């Protein structure tokens, strides 16, 4: 292993946590996405309810 390579085993958890996030995009959950998500959960709950309550 050359001098420039970094062994992943010697990187501590505090170094990983303290690194700044390079992706600064804002996570958005608007009303349409919320409705689609709730509809998906509801449809999946109806479909799998026969297996759960059998």
UniProtKB/Swiss-Prot annotation:
The chain crosses the membrane at residues 33-53. It is found in: Plastid, Chloroplast thylakoid membrane. Keywords: Chloroplast, Membrane, Photosynthesis, Photosystem II, Plastid, Reaction center, Thylakoid, Transmembrane, Transmembrane helix. InterPro entries: PSII_PsbL (IPR003372), PSII_PsbL_sf (IPR037266). The keyword Thylakoid applies. It is a single-pass membrane protein. It holds the Pfam family PsbL. The keyword Membrane applies. Its main location: plastid. GO terms for cellular component: chloroplast thylakoid membrane; photosystem II reaction center. One of its GO terms (biological process) is photosynthesis. Coiled coil: none annotated. One of the components of the core complex of photosystem II (PSII). PSII is a light-driven water:plastoquinone oxidoreductase that uses light energy to abstract electrons from H(2)O, generating O(2) and a proton gradient subsequently used for ATP formation. It consists of a core antenna complex that captures photons, and an electron transfer chain that converts photonic excitation into a charge separation. This subunit is found at the monomer-monomer interface and is required for correct PSII assembly and/or dimerization. PSII is composed of 1 copy each of membrane proteins PsbA, PsbB, PsbC, PsbD, PsbE, PsbF, PsbH, PsbI, PsbJ, PsbK, PsbL, PsbM, PsbT, PsbX, PsbY, PsbZ, Psb30/Ycf12, at least 3 peripheral proteins of the oxygen-evolving complex and a large number of cofactors. It forms dimeric complexes. Belongs to the PsbL family. This is Photosystem II reaction center protein L.
């Amino acid at each position: 292993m050359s001098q420039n390579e970094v062994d992943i085993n010697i990187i501590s958890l505090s170094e990983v946590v303290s690194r700044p996030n390079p992706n600064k995009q804002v996570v958005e959950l608007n009303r349409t996405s919320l409705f689609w998500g709730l509809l998906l959960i509801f449809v999946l709950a109806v479909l799998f309810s026969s297996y759960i309550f059998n």
